[in-house]
Amino acid sequence: MEMQEFVANFANQFDDTELEMFNSETRFRDLEEWSSLIGLAVLNMIAKKYDIKITPAELRSVETIEALYNLVVTKK
């Protein structure tokens, strides 16, 4: 798994936010479109694409897409 692929998969969970808004340093909860529903979609994407289970509490513990990526990598 590579960071760019993870960022793209993460960005695909959003409908209205421009792709240019997403990079490893993006503080995703600061995005206007962020919601608990998108959070669930992100958890589901990680489970399906990477076969990794991230809890809602773990998702809340990270601030950036890179931090979430690192969390996923440590669980592999």
Per-range role (PLM):
Residues M1-W34, I38-N44, K48-K76:
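Phosphopantetheine-dependent thiolation modules in NRPS/PKS and related acyl-activating systems
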